[in-house]
A protein has these predicted regions:
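Extended assembly-interface regions of large multimeric machines
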Residues: 1-203, 217
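Surface-exposed coil/turn segments at beta-strand junctions on protein surfaces, enriched
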Residues: 144-146, 263, 395
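Short, aromatic- and glycine-rich surface loops/edge beta-strands on solvent-exposed regions
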Residues: 110, 265-275, 398-405
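C-terminal domain/tail detector
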Residues: 24, 342-579
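Extracellular ectodomain segments of secreted/surface proteins
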Residues: 51-59, 77, 138-148, 154-167, ...
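Mixed-charge (acidic/basic) macromolecular-recognition segments
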Residues: 1-25, 29, 218-261, 267-269, ...
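Short linear motifs embedded in intrinsically disordered, proline/glycine-rich low-complexity segments
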Residues: 2-3, 10, 22, 47-58, ...
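Short, low-complexity Pro/Thr/Gly
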Residues: 158-361
Length: 579
């Protein structure tokens, strides 16, 4: 519209100049009368403005035909929507449970009806979760006799529990609070634990517990959305950090597998003694540390309306079957099969004829492209090809059946009230309640300005050490993954003051090991407390470990200004080649 409006303004201004220079001709066209213009001239102006606006838009679009093809084949996550996400809490009927119940990855949760049509948004869990016959009854912060801060976790147990069938090697917990408190809790549990004690009802004194808390969300199996085999894990880690930091507010309680719990146990307590005192003004309770929580994402299976194709047309718009509600969008095309049982291979797999498989492969392939429509929705187009299309031998009655993954788009946040997730999709043997602990996020779309695709190609062609040249390069690299326009994310990036690196060597088991020591100077005022800084540093350390050359290790050191405090991370080794 801005191109069209600009052309219309130009034509109106040019018409006024023409009327002053040629009043007789202007009178014949009514150009000199602003309120009574000739309707045929108006239509001519509008048509010319539309055509020239389209031409100007094409000149300004930075040749997406070149960049989108390369980016979609090598790094498809840069072109995909990041759907709405949230964190849900399952509440089983734990007093009646005898053993854990596992909720598989992809378990569906529905929202209450929202919007004019009463649509229920469908969310799926991003990882499996074990519902234990436990309840976290109380979380209390107190001071020990020696002046140290102690966090007491009291778990209530089902007295029907068969402890031989319960695996307590890890118990995930979620820090359910605003960012400053959640980050402070996360830091206290993962970086500030001095010792742990266990107390059970029949014991007079508490006993030492060889346990600890570890940070969750950084593992290869912790991705929020489906990974493409072509995508580099480190890039997804950055996108997840900037778009849904709640994912990293999970911690894992470890060490209880060594404890022999007696039958009929009613409760047990764990005292977590902190190495440094809890100096924050805010307190927390069991409302802020939750059990049986898992992230969910607004993705669900769909089918497309059948497509009738011919060899003369290669692009087709896709529409979800029976879903014309004005908000459902297609996330991915998972499979394409023709009415003659011909399987179409994804073009990116290079398993079609002429690709890596040469002559022993499918004759057909498909590719997808996303374009933003006039309504604001992102529409998916299917592009088909192969030898049959090149030779025009596609059967006339050929139709395609497609399996899709869809999303509800912006509907979860368009409702006047916050969307509530409170219904499980599948029935289970036990009674389970569910609720969302945070408001569903808005979907994030790839940036469409500032030559984004060209910046992506420039970044992905750089080496690991080039990121460490200066603070501006690192800020620019991280900004490629900040799609939310969040003020807090902008402040975190601007807080990067300086970046230095130097080579380091050490001997390990008789071998010389080479690495890189990276020093990042941060302005502490750009973060919501020390816990926020530690989470940012952990993200950087993990990303550098994934991105670094395979023969190097890296060690991150963060220097805080204005205090000059140094935070050091353990050295990490690359386990795969980025790309």
């Amino acid at each position: 519209m801005r191109y069209y409006d600009a052309e219309m303004r130009y034509l109106l201004e040019a018409g006024e100049e023409f009327a002053r220079a040629h009043p007789e001709q202007a009178a014949m066209l009514n150009l000199d009368k602003a309120g009574a213009r000739d309707p045929f001239v108006e239509r001519l102006f509008e048509g010319f403005a539309f055509l020239m606006g389209r031409m100007r838009e094409k000149l300004d679009d930075d040749l997406p035909e070149l960049t989108e093809g390369v980016v979609s084949l090598l790094w498809p996550h840069y072109l995909r929507t990041i759907p709405s996400m949230s964190v849900v809490e399952f509440t089983p009927d734990w007093p009646e449970m005898k053993e854990p119940m596992t909720m598989a990855k992809g378990f569906e949760v529905l929202s209450r009806p929202i919007g004019e049509k009463g649509t229920r948004c469908r969310y799926t869990t991003t990882k499996a979760i074990a519902l234990q016959p436990l309840s976290l009854e109380r979380v209390q912060l107190a001071t020990d006799t020696d002046g140290r801060s102690v966090i007491t976790l009291r778990f209530t147990c089902s007295q029907l529990t068969d402890w031989r069938r319960v695996d307590l090697s890890h118990i995930p917990l979620y820090c359910n609070a605003d960012a400053p408190l959640a980050c402070a809790m996360h830091e206290a549990f993962t970086l500030n634990v001095a010792r742990m004690w266990l107390h059970m009802p029949d014991e007079v004194d508490r006993r030492p517990l060889d346990g600890y808390f570890s940070a969750l969300g950084f593992g290869e199996d912790d991705g929020l959305w489906p990974e493409d085999g072509r995508s580099f894990r480190g890039y997804q880690l950055l996108l997840e950090y900037f778009t849904f930091r709640e994912k990293f507010m999970f911690i894992d309680l470890r060490g209880l597998e060594t404890v022999a719990f007696p039958a009929g146990l009613a409760w047990f307590e764990i005292d977590v003694v902190l190495a440094e005192r809890w100096e924050h003004d805010f307190r927390f309770s069991e409302k802020h540390l939750r059990l049986h929580c898992v992230p969910v994402i607004n993705l669900f299976p769909l089918e497309s309306d059948p497509l009738t194709i011919n060899s003369l047309q290669t692009e087709y718009p896709l529409r979800p079957m029976r879903v014309q509600d004005g908000h459902t969008e297609i996330y991915t095309v998972d499979s394409v099969i023709s009415s003659h049982q011909q399987v179409y291979a994804p073009f990116s797999s290079f398993r079609h004829k002429g690709g890596m498989m040469r002559h022993d492969a499918a004759d057909y392939y498909y590719h997808t492209r996303v374009r933003r429509g006039p309504s604001g929705l992102y529409n998916t187009w299917l592009i088909v090809g192969g030898e049959a299309f090149d030779n025009h031998t596609v059967p006339e009655d050929e139709s395609l059946s497609l399996t899709l993954t869809g999303t509800n788009g912006q509907l979860p946040r368009r409702a006047l009230q916050s969307t509530v997730l409170d219904t499980v999709m599948k029935t289970t043997s036990a009674s389970i309640a569910v609720r969302n602990l945070c408001a569903p996020t808005l979907p994030c779309y790839p940036p469409a300005q500032d030559r984004f695709h060209w910046r992506v190609l420039s970044h992905l062609g750089s080496s690991f050490l080039s990121l460490m040249d200066n603070a501006e390069v690192l800020r620019g690299t991280l900004a490629l993954y900040e799609w939310t326009d969040s003020e807090m994310n902008r402040r975190r990036l601007e807080a990067i003051l300086d970046v230095k690196h130097r080579a380091t060597e050490r001997f390990a088991q008789g071998h010389l090991v080479r690495g890189v020591q990276i020093e990042v100077t941060l302005d502490s005022h750009g973060f919501a407390g020390r816990g926020d800084i530690c989470l940012f540093g952990e993200m950087l350390s993990r990303f550098f470990a994934l991105y670094t050359d395979i023969y190097l290790f890296n060690r991150l050191i963060i220097i805080l200004q204005p205090t000059g405090e140094r935070l050091e991370w353990e050295e990490k080794h690359s386990r795969r080649i980025p790309g």
